[in-house]
């Protein structure tokens, strides 16, 4: 059976939130892979296996700016949704870098809704 790329890869340091996001996105009908840190696993960085959307939470990332600079080499910015966090990059900084963003405080439902909207625009 041929492996296909996931619709979404969730990158988030906190397993409860990551697990809830993954579960809700799966419930919405998406193929989802969830990981706790950047970079994403090598197989998902290969051509033909990259996710349609990368959802990345900046909370607790040691170097958020450098991480987003690396992300730009893997996926086009229009396919990335960044969850901003207090003490990391501001929403304006993320926007200037060309990424979609959603600001904390935010609910799981709001993140799932924003992810679904982005996936719909990319069809």
Language-model regions, residue ranges each:
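Non-catalytic signal-transmission and effector/linker regions of two-component phosphorelay proteins
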Residues: 1-28, 42-52, 69-73, 107-123
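Short beta-strand element of Class I
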Residues: 32
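Conserved phosphotransfer microenvironments
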Residues: 39-42, 50-77, 87-90
């Amino acid at each position: 059976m041929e492996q296909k790329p996931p619709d979404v890869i969730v990158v988030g340091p906190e397993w409860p939130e990551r697990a809830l996001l993954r579960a809700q996105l799966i419930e919405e009908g998406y193929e989802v892979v969830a990981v706790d840190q950047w970079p994403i696993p090598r197989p998902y960085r290969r051509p033909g296996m990259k996710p349609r959307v990368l959802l990345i939470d900046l909370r607790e990332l040691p170097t958020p700016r450098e991480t987003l600079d690396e992300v730009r080499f893997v996926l086009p910015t229009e396919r990335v949704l960044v969850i901003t966090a207090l003490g990391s990059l501001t929403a304006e900084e993320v926007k200037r870098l060309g990424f979609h963003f959603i600001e904390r405080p935010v609910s799981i439902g709001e993140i799932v809704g924003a992810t679904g909207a982005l996936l719909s625009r990319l069809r």
